[in-house]
Amino acid sequence: MLPKSDNSLLLRTDFSDDAAWAALCEAVRVPSEEGFQAHLDCISDPVYDGLTVEQLVTLVPKGGDRDHVFAFVADRIALTEPEQPILVVDLYDEPGRTFRVIPREMWGVENNLSIANMDYSEFADNADPDGVFRGFPQS
């Protein structure tokens, strides 16, 4: 089971660098220029060490009320790449579908998905060709 929380979850699945984890948790909490920020619980529990997307999906009960319809994952890529691209996993509409998001865009993803203002696919479909969401195109 996933932890109960009123906030979205950022699950640590790579425990190789404590400083990188601390830096990532700090980066995702930086407010946007407009003052928006992600509402997250940074979960560092060794029970999630090495957790795969497939395993994460199985932690969500089938049917009934769900506390979390998506989750953020701090895997090895998020903790080692310069842009810190965090994995975003759909746990509801298309369980297991993923894209990545950079910390400065995390607030928009978290805020909009948590209140169902936007759909998961709107962010996933606007990720760059490398699978990372860096914001919507400027019009």
Describe the role of every protein-language-model region.
Residues 1-121, 139:
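Short helix/strand-capping turn motifs
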Residues 126-139:
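Short linear, low-complexity motifs centered on an aromatic residue
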